[in-house]
A protein has these predicted regions:
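Positively charged n-region of N-terminal signal peptides that target proteins for export
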Residues: 1-6, 430
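Sec-dependent N-terminal signal peptides
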Residues: 6-15
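Sec/Tat signal peptide C-region and signal peptidase I cleavage site
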Residues: 18-22
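Surface-exposed, beta-sheet-biased, low-hydrophobicity segments with strongly acidic/polar composition
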Residues: 23-336
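Surface-exposed loop/edge segments in extracytoplasmic proteins
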Residues: 184-186, 385-391, 422
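Residue-level detector of functionally pivotal "anchor" positions at catalytic/ligand-binding pockets or at interdomain
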Residues: 331-352, 358-359, 363, 367-369, ...
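Short, surface-exposed loop/turn motifs with a glycine/proline- and acidic-biased composition
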Residues: 364, 391-419, 428
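Short, glycine-anchored, charge-dense loop/turn motifs used at functional sites
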Residues: 378-387, 412
């Protein structure tokens, strides 16, 4: 029935307890090294998973075939500048005069799926900024050129012209890179098979090497550096600025709890507020005091984090050694909250076939393992207009049909709601 694919929808009812487990807090720390040169992948259950240099990679491409995200490592000195003087036909005549007035773009710090190259979609429905989706080949074909600055601020700083040629239907990314004068013109393929079970595949253009950055999916948090919009008091503008912060793995959810002492938190109030936010933990737990030249920590700021395994943890920070040591100190506590979890393949349920065949039926596949549960399916178009809805009862392995007859080609959102839990998937009808 599922065509050799497993789709799971598991909802474990929330526990009735309102307080965290009555146990001691566990103190822990991670070491990013002097100068904060390293990043640390961390599991709330098992501690540090792996440590590696922040500067190893320069480009990252999604492992999700229905996504098109390309991220840049800004901390390693990578800058992405949109080329305004032509499309890919201008490759041979690439002209950098006046480039300092061109638009520089950065990764989104909240959405895993928005990198510097696809931060803002283009004017067309299938335009993802760096490329356009081809419904016949199911590829994203690059239609834009970029100026890449590698190693900005270092003696080895270089300028490259860059062309994301295409993302093929297997999820590989083919890119073309050359010096501005056209020399050293090289095409690389970032292969999906090189990063099986990971969020991204990574590449270092300078060294012409594939990079193995991520460990397996057995991590929840990443202690690293990233560029965040930061208010600059000198210019009065908000500018991208490198900060040391904590990113979340895909599937790790969190919510910041302000103004409540950690031992008085009513967990059931916040359980349904956890959300998917790349920097949901982030960097706001610390502030550098310009008077004392020391870091100050928010005593009443605690994070409720739902880990990859579905367990809920409380987390608060107690110290940061800055660039002198790179050590981060924190306390964590596993709660007695039961998990509200969509398990397996990402968040666990899915729509298939996707892309759909226009006029044919698509299906939502679910598998509820904990009794009957009321739910609803809702489908909306790109403008948010409802085109289909159905109330359903989830109970065991099921599939629900959604007719697409009469629907125009486009990108649609299909939402599955049960109680306070709402999850959304995108459906493409070519």
């Amino acid at each position: 029935m599922f065509q050799n694919k497993s789709f799971f929808f598991a909802l474990l009812l929330a526990g009735s307890a309102s307080q965290a487990v009555a146990q001691n807090w566990t103190n822990d720390s991670v070491n990013m090294g002097p100068g904060i040169r390293n990043e640390v992948f961390y599991s709330l259950s098992n501690g540090t998973v792996s440590t590696g240099s922040i500067n190893l990679w320069e480009l990252a491409h999604t492992q999700t075939t229905m996504d098109n995200c390309i991220r840049a490592n800004h901390v390693a000195g990578v800058r992405v500048v949109l080329y305004p003087k032509g499309d890919t036909a201008a490759w041979s005549s690439f002209d950098t005069s006046g480039w300092k007035r061109w638009r520089m773009v950065f990764n989104d710090i909240h959405d895993h799926k928005k990198g510097a190259f696809n931060q803002q979609p283009g004017p067309g429905m299938w335009d993802f900024n760096w490329g356009v989706y081809n419904s016949s080949t199911h590829e994203v074909v690059g239609d834009s050129l970029h100026l890449l600055i590698l190693g900005e601020g270092t003696p080895g700083m270089t300028y490259k012209k860059f062309w994301p040629v295409k993302q093929d239907r297997q999820g590989n990314l083919i890119v073309r890179v050359a010096n501005i004068d056209g020399s050293n013109d090289t095409t690389y393929t970032m292969k999906r098979a090189d990063a099986t079970g990971k969020n991204y595949k990574y590449f270092n253009i300078t060294n012409k090497q594939t990079v193995n950055r991520e460990p397996s999916q057995s991590w929840d948090l990443l202690f690293t550096q990233y560029f965040a919009p930061t208010f600059d008091p000198r210019s009065g503008r908000v500018l991208p600025y490198p900060v040391m912060g904590v990113e979340s793995n895909m599937g790790t959810l969190s919510v910041a709890i302000n103004g409540v002492h950690r031992d008085s938190i009513n967990l059931s109030t916040y359980q349904m507020q956890v959300k998917d936010d790349l920097t949901g933990v982030g960097a706001d737990w610390k502030r550098f005091d310009q008077t004392t030249f020391r870091y100050v920590y928010k005593d009443s700021l605690t994070y409720l984090v739902k880990a990859k395994d579905g367990e809920y943890w409380l987390l608060y920070f107690t110290g940061f050694g800055g660039s002198s040591t790179g050590k981060v100190y924190f306390s964590k506590q596993k709660t007695n909250l039961s998990s509200v979890a969509f398990a397996a393949m990402g968040l666990g349920w899915n729509v298939y076939p996707n892309p759909a065949v226009q006029g044919n039926t698509v299906f939502v596949g679910t598998d509820l393992n904990n009794g009957r549960l009321a739910a609803s399916i809702r489908m909306t178009d790109a403008l948010g207009r409802e085109v289909y809805s159905q109330n359903i009862s989830l109970n065991g392995l099921q599939q629900f049909a959604i007719p697409t007859q009469g629907l125009k080609s486009g990108l649609y959102n299909i939402s599955l709601r049960s109680g306070n839990v709402l999850e959304t998937r995108k459906l493409l009808i070519p």
